[in-house]
A protein has these predicted regions:
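Conserved NTP-donor binding/palm subdomain of two-metal-ion nucleotidyltransferases/polymerases, i.e.
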Residues: 51, 177-180, 191-203, 212
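Charged, glycine/proline-rich intrinsically disordered loops and linkers
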Residues: 104-120, 197-215
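Glycine-enriched alpha-helix->loop->beta-strand junction motifs that scaffold or abut catalytic
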Residues: 166-168
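Noncatalytic, basic helical substrate-engagement surface that gates or grips nucleic-acid strands
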Residues: 2-14, 18-164, 183, 191
């Protein structure tokens, strides 16, 4: 879900081509969830293999990722969530309830042959389980793509990697990486440049965005600590927000009073009792420092065995992805040679 601060975000629209040669730390769970939600049959059922195992996320990971890399020259390091923080239990419970409600409504829509409604409810039913995550990691290994297993929040790990300068930016649809200290966040990096709206049965243009944390903080004349306090007022994955306080009101409060402790009594008494612990989640996140984002050669045999023999993918389609990976490897070799010649000329 993430924190809702969109109304106050300072963003700039960018062309995907401007990311050429950059490496992004991808919020892998967020990306895979998007694939699970949108890659479906007309009645809303996820793609599956002959054993009934979901493959929608694998199709998205293989074909859309390689397309972005070939078309725009961007690199990816995928970051997976570790065990959830105990304070996230409320959010996880809300998601379960929403899925259960959507499943009932999906079944009712199918009985009415209302496939548009069924499709929109199926999107909400999406659940990324450990088997799917294991399959995604296996696919990335076959592709030679780097991935990092975070000890806690994947967004915190991605932000750390960006802050260290090991990647250029974090890549997620949520804004939480900014709270965790990522200097840059890239949103809406897609192949089609459009977003499908299941409930309306239509789509809208989706333009990639770049958000730079220093620019955002400077624009609003706040610190990152105050940004975190603002998020706590609005609501995060670790606490419910205060009723009646949206992003704009929260911004005014932190600008006027400086911190949660200094807010008026009628605000302070409605704060979560553990707000200092929530601050700590963002300011002192649980991350790992021993990671590698080196891209390795793909293993073609591994790709065909896993996808075609075990998961029922078409060899012709997998061959397309293999050709893209070859092109990516060749491009990297040529770029490395150009850099070497430049350094030794």
């Amino acid at each position: 879900m993430g924190v809702n601060v969109r109304p106050i975000i300072v963003r700039q629209e960018i062309r995907p081509e401007t990311l050429r040669g950059r490496v992004l730390a991808v919020d892998a769970n967020n990306m895979l969830y998007q694939f699970l939600s949108l890659i479906r049959t007309p009645d809303g059922v996820s793609l599956k293999d002959r054993e009934g195992r979901t493959t929608s996320h694998l199709a998205g990971l293989l074909f859309r990722t390689t397309r972005l890399m070939v078309d725009y020259g961007v690199g990816f390091a995928f970051v997976f969530d570790g065990p959830p923080h105990p304070l996230k239990a409320r959010v996880l419970a809300d998601r379960r309830s929403a899925r259960e409600k959507a499943m009932t409504e999906w079944g009712e829509a199918l009985k009415r042959h209302d496939f548009q409604t069924a499709w929109s409810k199926a999107v909400v039913m999406s659940k990324l389980d450990q088997a799917m995550i294991s399959d995604a990691k296996r696919l990335l290994s076959c592709m030679g793509m780097p991935y990092v297993e975070a000890p806690g929040e994947g967004e915190a790990q991605a932000a750390y990697m960006a802050a260290q300068g090991d990647v250029w930016a974090a890549n997620s649809r949520d804004y939480d990486t900014l709270l965790f200290g990522s200097p840059r966040l890239v949103r809406y990096l897609t192949v089609s440049g459009r977003e499908f709206l299941p409930s309306k049965g239509t789509s809208r243009p989706l333009i990639p965005e770049l958000i730079e944390l220093p620019c955002f903080l400077s624009h609003h004349k706040i610190t990152r600590e105050q940004f975190i306090d603002l998020a706590i007022l609005v609501g995060t994955d670790f606490n419910e927000g205060i009723t009646g306080i949206g992003p704009k009101t929260a911004l005014k409060l932190v600008q006027q009073f400086g911190s949660l402790e200094s807010t008026p009594d009628n605000i302070r008494e409605r704060l979560p009792q553990d707000f200092e612990a929530i601050r700590g989640i963002f300011l002192r996140p649980n991350v790992r420092q021993d990671y590698s984002i080196v891209q390795r050669p793909m293993d073609e045999h591994c790709l065909f065995r896993f996808l075609c023999q075990e998961r029922g993918f078409s060899p012709e389609r997998v061959r397309i992805a293999v050709e893209r990976l070859r092109a990516i490897a060749k491009s990297r070799q040529e770029l490395g040679l150009v850099r070497w010649l430049g350094e030794h000329s």
